[in-house]
């Protein structure tokens, strides 16, 4: 593996070739570049970072048998390149059969009640099974499922079944299901053409809100409660927080943000530290968080509007509310929030620190900025909920349509030549993954922590909270996630094995635009691994890869 450090290099000749290719593509709209962004000093040739942050997928849930797909007749076929490197997958670990979740009696008969002894083993989900149950992905439940690193109690602690289904799909053993390249075809194609990590984790255990905060701040401590009906989390009655042991609180589960008019005001919280948006604003670098459903003035085709805008998904057979407040990274911070969902004053103002929208936008605004050539330096993207992959209300096929449409659009712009797209997820949803990271940040809450025994997650040092003192509630690394980089500068058909986490994203932003400035206040950006090994800035640039949103196949 040729791991290269970030370095500034000349790239005008190569970029010109990419613009020429884009202009020659028939039917592709080509818009102006973003001149203000392009002249910013960066440590790499990357002038634009787009972070597509989807929901609730473990690495093995999507890549258990990569790069080998079953290729069942009638499904989009996937055939890997001959030189595809090996990844740390279920199949490579020889855990598709005789899995420890089958042999551990602690999972009980519930996991096996329909499908015999096979139910505790991993099993393939096909395209007709795209709609699944939402698994238990709470902080404590995930620790219990990983069972001291043995990863053998998933059906017992995180598994849920689909009522009315048959076989393992109807039981808690559904948590052992995985897709292959016949369903998540686009992601497998991106992994073939660009770069992927098989060693990316959440920074702590737990669901969406902790993951969202880690992606922008690397810190879940320093939570302030604005209103709550709940007590600190226990095994019997989980809640969104624990006492941190220093007189404050650490957020460990989902809760709506204080600074959002769409939040459930009975339970809302805010964060007291800094996030990456604060650093970018201080440096006058354009950025934005773009979320499906954020524009409350829009009326959807089904007549819904405001906070309850929704979209019908035939796959999950439901109307799904587009915007979910507890997924909104920046609404937990007074400095980067837009409580009233105020619209930007113009497309030209998108990304600006002086506009009333305060960097919080609808996903449609991102497309408008692309079309206008006003592409922010840093963009965080959240799809409408029906397309964000979250089991229970979304699915991998709706996700693929949204994801591929967005990536195709970015690749058609001249700014593609200086863009990196990161695709990753906020948490694992509790889906089985065989890889258990060694704990590097311990926690000893008497109730919430159960990984190494009652009241214990690891045996080492507690990480620092916002005050600089060691705190509870930040046990990790947590669960393993897909993490892909799509860019002209991504390594080709490459798998990086260096440990990274969600906090590696703000670290990259800091290294590329902010001269290595860190957030401070105990943020994991200091210790998070670098994503440098996913790039090669000295190789010829990668061409864009256009895919069919419906099938994930390459567009000929």
Language-model region placement:
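Bacterial N-terminal signal peptides
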Residues: 16-27
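N-terminal secretory signal peptides that target proteins for export/translocation
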Residues: 1-11
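N-terminal pro-sequences and low-complexity stem/linker regions of secreted or lumenal proteins
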Residues: 32-556
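A periodicity- and composition-biased signal for non-globular, repetitive helical segments
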Residues: 10, 19-20, 133, 513
